[in-house]
């Protein structure tokens, strides 16, 4: 006998397996109510932003999430110094972090994506996130552990229901268990913290975020995939320092598929707070693999430590500053430098030099006592090839081959660790947060993004080199896997294509344009002895012009393209000049572009006991 549950057809044996997993997940397992000490995306950190901008608190750790000792100290300060609205929010979180050390939670959700040109209703994505989560503290919070242990379950691929360039909010990506049409993923995060509020160590498996732009950082993005982290932080009135060493996942260099171990990220940042209205930060990150390197655990400049290993790792540097000209108002800027040819800049100018850089600047305003709790306006630009990096078969050769893993690009499990937008993009974003009544939280957003495939700007010779390579060697989709280096077996590093020495920022003929307008709301009922219920609903309108820009333009054809000499090539039993062959593939890529309008709907019910 077979029975349908939420549109999923299950036979008797599978039903028994389904309910067994469901029962176990309620007892032991994460997803719905992530803990403040585990999840850097929790609303708590937006509240901290407001409290800091208005001068209620002065010293917060540079890395999110915070240890329980810091969270409690922040909440106590706000309860003592804040207005009625601040106190109400702080007390709500105080109950969470000082309550019982475990909570059983579950979230049931439904998502629907509707293409405006499609007449049928389409299929609904049903999701279930059962969990156990909580905080454990010892020795007056000198030792604390936050945990969020559970399952993420879907009846369809979640990637098909996300807006363009959006990261999934859950760490459920691989090693699924199929129960009929239901895909179940293990999802666990935990953070162990040891120390006092001004100096501490954290370790565990969790997402981490850095910088003034929550969920949109250029170096460590709060909504990127989780990592195994070990960090040290010290927070002082005039300066702070943090250092994090992370184990991450390497994926195929061509498309970010599959996964392999032995890839690492090291990050550290030093912030100076000269006056209450101004702070300045310098940070470095470095990606490396196939070895453990203790030199990146030391508080020394990575640009110096890298020299010991021969400059084979992927180093980035950044500068950030925050200006608070008025209570509740912040102007923040973050400059992330991946690769910048300084000599070329002075010799040839900015338009004719290698400049792999990301910049984000914006204004954030958090009124003191208003139902509008946050207003933000920011602009982001990512130059071509930012975050990309080639890897080689081994450290003795510049050979790049089909199917190899990349241990050097700025991804974890194939997901960008910085901005979620691809290189050669810019984005303007406006957001509003409202709390008209305390249990109701409303968020409104409006964004406009442009993206170009850098391969529209390369030369015919460079395009032919891509086409004549083996399939799976080079990506030409203009994304984070599309680096500018070609294989160089006779050297120790690849050869950069000449076009990468020109800026070419959004100068392509066929740009992708994305407009998004959205609204979401969440309402929580009063907490009772039997638990608490929360409801959420959201809608997003998305307009895309030239969808498909981010697809391969010059896929490798290997021996299918024959060089007949004199600038003539044979492909598919036809002869072409070099320029005609390039035009053939470029025109095929252009023919695949389309305009699209999408509507995204989601509803959710959360329960916590």
Feature locations, PLM:
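Positively charged n-region of N-terminal signal peptides that target proteins for export
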Residues: 2-4, 12-18
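Bacterial N-terminal signal peptides
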Residues: 20-30
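Boundary at the C-terminal end of the N-terminal hydrophobic targeting segment
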Residues: 32-34
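Outer-membrane beta-barrel channel domains
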Residues: 39-42, 54-62, 66-279, 290, ...
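Exposed, low-structure sequence patches enriched in small/polar residues
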Residues: 274, 278-286, 291-609
């Amino acid at each position: 006998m077979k029975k349908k549950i939420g549109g999923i057809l299950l036979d008797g044996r599978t039903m028994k397996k389904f309910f067994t997993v469901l029962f176990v997940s309620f007892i032991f397992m994460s997803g719905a109510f992530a803990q403040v000490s585990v999840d850097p995306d929790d609303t708590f950190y937006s509240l901290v932003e407001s409290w800091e901008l208005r001068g209620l608190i002065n010293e917060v750790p540079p890395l999110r999430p915070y240890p329980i000792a810091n969270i409690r100290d922040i909440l106590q300060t706000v309860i003592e110094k804040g207005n009625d609205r601040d106190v109400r929010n702080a007390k709500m979180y105080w109950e969470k972090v000082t309550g019982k050390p475990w909570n059983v939670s579950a979230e049931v959700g439904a998502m629907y994506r509707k293409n405006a040109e499609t007449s049928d209703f389409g299929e609904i994505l049903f999701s279930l996130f059962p969990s156990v989560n909580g905080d454990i503290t010892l020795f007056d919070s000198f030792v604390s552990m936050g945990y969020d242990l559970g399952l993420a379950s879907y009846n369809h691929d979640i990637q098909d229901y996300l807006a363009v360039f959006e990261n999934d909010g859950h760490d459920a990506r691989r090693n699924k268990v199929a129960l009929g049409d239901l895909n179940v993923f293990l999802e666990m995060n935990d953070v162990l913290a040891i120390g006092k509020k001004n100096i501490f160590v954290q370790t565990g498996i969790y997402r981490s975020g850095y910088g003034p732009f929550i969920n949109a950082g250029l170096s460590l993005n709060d909504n990127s995939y989780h990592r195994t982290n070990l960090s040290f932080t010290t927070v002082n009135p005039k300066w702070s320092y943090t250092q994090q060493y992370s184990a991450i996942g390497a994926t195929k260099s061509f498309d970010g598929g599959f996964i392999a171990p032995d890839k690492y990220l090291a990050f550290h940042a030093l912030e100076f707070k000269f006056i209450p209205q101004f702070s300045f930060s310098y940070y470095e990150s470095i990606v490396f693999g196939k070895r453990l390197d203790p030199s990146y655990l030391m508080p020394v400049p990575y640009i110096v430590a890298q020299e010991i290993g021969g400059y084979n790792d992927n180093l980035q540097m950044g500068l950030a500053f925050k200006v608070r000209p008025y209570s509740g108002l912040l102007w923040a800027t973050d400059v992330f430098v991946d690769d910048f040819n300084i000599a070329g800049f002075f010799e040839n100018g900015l338009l004719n030099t290698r400049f792999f850089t990301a910049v984000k600047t914006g204004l954030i305003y958090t009124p003191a006592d208003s139902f509008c709790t946050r207003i933000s306006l920011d602009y982001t630009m990512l130059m071509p090839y930012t975050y990309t990096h080639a890897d080689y078969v081994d450290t003795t050769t510049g050979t790049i081959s089909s199917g190899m893993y990349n241990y050097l690009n700025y991804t974890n499990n194939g997901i960008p660790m910085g901005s979620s937008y691809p290189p050669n993009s810019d984005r303007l974003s406006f957001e509003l947060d409202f709390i008209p009544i305390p249990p109701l939280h409303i968020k409104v957003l409006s964004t406009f993004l442009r993206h170009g495939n850098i391969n529209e700007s390369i030369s015919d010779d460079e395009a032919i080199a891509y086409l004549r390579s083996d399939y799976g060697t080079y990506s030409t989709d203009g994304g984070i896997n599309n680096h500018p280096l070609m294989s160089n077996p006779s050297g120790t590093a690849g050869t950069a294509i000449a076009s990468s020495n020109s800026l070419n920022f959004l100068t392509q003929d066929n740009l992708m344009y994305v407009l998004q307008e959205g609204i979401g709301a969440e309402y929580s009922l009063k907490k009772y002895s039997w638990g608490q219920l929360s409801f959420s609903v959201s809608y997003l309108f998305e307009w895309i012009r030239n969808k498909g820009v981010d697809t391969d333009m010059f896929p490798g054809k290997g021996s299918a393209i024959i060089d007949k000499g004199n600038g003539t090539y044979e492909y598919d039993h036809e002869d072409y000049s070099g320029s005609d062959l390039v035009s053939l593939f470029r025109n095929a890529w252009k023919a695949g572009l389309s305009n699209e309008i999408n509507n995204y709907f989601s509803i959710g019910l959360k329960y916590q006991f």
